[in-house]
Amino acid sequence: MLDAFSRAVVSADSKGATIGSAELSSLRKYVADANKRIDATLAITQNVSCIAADAISGMVCENTGLTQPGGHCYPTRRMAACLRDGEIILRYVSYALLAGDPSVLDDRCINGLKETYIALGVPLSNAIRAIEIMKIATVAIMTETNSGRKMFEGINSGSGAECKDIASEAASYFDRVIDALN
């Protein structure tokens, strides 16, 4: 995983050139958005357990057979595994968001996820639904559209309304995970 600065240096070095004005402009934007990235990542990390638990609960409410004997969230150790997986996905989304680079998500989370779930007999449609719910909740927290909670009040980045671009980026990382499972 390379941050924006490392990527610019590696790219310029591979070309045997100095860092160009387009790259510097991109780095300026990255620096300008740094507080928003930190605050958005904080929004995820402070709410990771709730986001994952709500997503798994939502998935189960939509398919109550999951918690019945023979269901994929029965017994409780399977439910715990679902919660753990949700938290892991959120963790890697937060890493990608902070770095502004999805490679850590691709390399350490997405790579082999579908094959692992298939091997374990996890219904991909249920996993995808849980990730969709996590995406919706995360974006709502970042943009402060979740039942009035003011995540960014008094924080450097301003308001959640000012973080829509970062929330959109976070949503794209969830979409990467969903696409990998399709």
From Swiss-Prot:
Keywords: Bile pigment, Chromophore. GO terms for biological process: photosynthesis. CDD domains: PE-PC-PEC_beta. Disulfide bonds: none annotated. One of its GO terms (cellular component) is phycobilisome. Pfam families: Phycobilisome. Induction: Constitutively expressed at low levels. Homodimer. Prochlorococcus does not possess phycobilisomes, instead it uses a divinyl-chlorophyll antenna complex for light harvesting. Belongs to the phycobiliprotein family. This is R-phycoerythrin subunit beta. It comes from Prochlorococcus marinus (strain SARG / CCMP1375 / SS120). The lineage of its organism: Bacteria, Bacillati, Cyanobacteriota, Cyanophyceae, Synechococcales.
